[in-house]
Amino acid sequence: MNCKVIACYFGERKEYPSNQKEAVSVLRDVVENEKTLSPGVSQLDTILVNHDCGMKYGNGYLNYIDGEETYAGTIRVLNRPWDNGVGASFGSFNWAFEELRDEYDYWFFQEDDYKIIYDHYYARGIKMLVNDSDLGFVGYDRGSKTDRMYNLDNIFNYFN
C-alpha cells in the first residue's frame, strides 16, 4: 500500500497562499492534480493532514472532499490538534506516520502549496528505493526556468 501525505494549513502565512481562502484555492488545484496525474502505481491514497487552527472555510473544504477518489486511490483527511503550531508541516507528516504507519509500505510527503507535475513519479521513487539498498528516502524538488529566475543555479551547482 502506498500513500502521499500533504500537510494542510489554513492560517495566515508570510507568502502566497497567505490566508485560508488562497490556501483552499491552491489545495483545490493540488487535489485536481491528484485526480488526473498518474503516479505510476495502481494504488496511492492521498492523506491530507489538517493542522487545525480553527479555520471553518478550510476545514469545511477538507470535510467535503474526504473520501473522494483520486487517480489511484482515495482522499483521507486527518485532523491534528493545533498545539500552538508546534511542528508545522513536519509535525503533520509525523502525525500521519504515527497514526497510519501499519497501513502503508511507501510514503511520500508534500507541502500543500506544491504540485507534482510528472507522470509516474511515485513508481520511479519506489524503483530507486528497491534498486539501491543504500537509499533510505528519495527527495523530490524543483528544477526549472522559474527557479533560474530566482538565481538558484548556484544552489543547484553546489550539489552537483
Predicted regions and their residues:
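Conserved catalytic core of nucleotide-sugar-dependent glycosyltransferases
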Residues: K115-N160
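Short beta-strand-to-loop acidic/aromatic patch adjacent to the donor-nucleotide binding site
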Residues: Y104-I117
